[in-house]
Amino acid sequence: MSSSQNDIPEPVFVGGSARSGTHAIGRLLGSHPNDLQLPIESRFHCGTGGLTDLLNGNTDIDAYRERCLGKWWQRGLRQHLGLKRLIERDDLEAALERLRAGLDDDPLQAGSRFVREILDPLAERAGKPVWVDLSGANIRQAPTLLKLFPRARFIHMVRDGRAVTAAILKKRDMTDDLAQAFGHWEMRVRRSDAALRQMPPDAVLTIYLDDLTAHDREAQFARIVDYLRMDDPAPMRAYFDETISPERAHVGAWRERMAPADARWVDRRYRRLVRQLRREGIDWVPEPGGQ
């Protein structure tokens, strides 16, 4: 990135539908010496009932505090994820009290300071000026996050809805309901589009997973480098060449990842939905093509 640390765009928020490649691009960015991929999706800043909802009046500080110290403190099948990976509990409680105290005077400043109290020390200990968060709701909450972090960058990961559906069905801790899996993709698309319409031009970089991994690798890699103002992308380039591949992303393999009847159902629904979304002006979803 830029040799002047003040010119480095930070932080970086990556978001999109579940199973759309957010973690793949997070690891790619984390291979750069300046970028720390956070060890978890932090969620506390953008999830439902999170900090952005607090700042927008959709929840209150007591309910938010309870979430931070409760369901967001530890989560996952083995309860190994959550804020406990990022901060000591006593430090989190103290930061929450400072957030409470600052909300009346300057809520945006208080919110930004709260996020930085939790996440900046991780990057500082790693000797990196930028942290990268992969919470799925980052794009949905991008308009508020941009107010908190005016120098932030947002990467919107997009993937064919049929491939997302197949990947969700394969994920043990998500769902095995076909309609629910497909509905998740549609919901995320609509919510993301509503947020994107509120963002300034060129504030968000949209990356199609299939293009990044298979169809347009060089151009997509260059777009990421330019967007993040990277002076020396060589370490990231090495990771990209060695690790980012069509095979790992299961490009074009969604039919093989579900039962034939389910694949036909998803294909029909996807083609109809893409036409409907186009009519609504949502023109960034991948075309079904001949797949």
For each of these PLM feature ranges, what is it?
Residues 97-235, 257:
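PAPS-dependent sulfotransferase catalytic domain
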Residues 13, 24, 153, 208, ...:
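Amphipathic alpha-helical recognition patches that constitute DNA-binding helices
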Residues 58-60, 64-91, 134, 139-145, ...:
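Anion-recognition interface
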Residues 32-39, 228-232:
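A generic secondary-structure signal for well-formed alpha-helical elements
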Residues 1-13, 108-109, 169-172, 193-197, ...:
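PAPS-dependent sulfotransferases, especially Golgi type II membrane carbohydrate sulfotransferases
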Residues 17:
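P-loop (Walker A) phosphate-binding loop of NTP-binding proteins
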Residues 39-131:
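PAPS-dependent sulfation machinery
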Residues 23-35:
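A conserved segment at the C-terminal end of the G1
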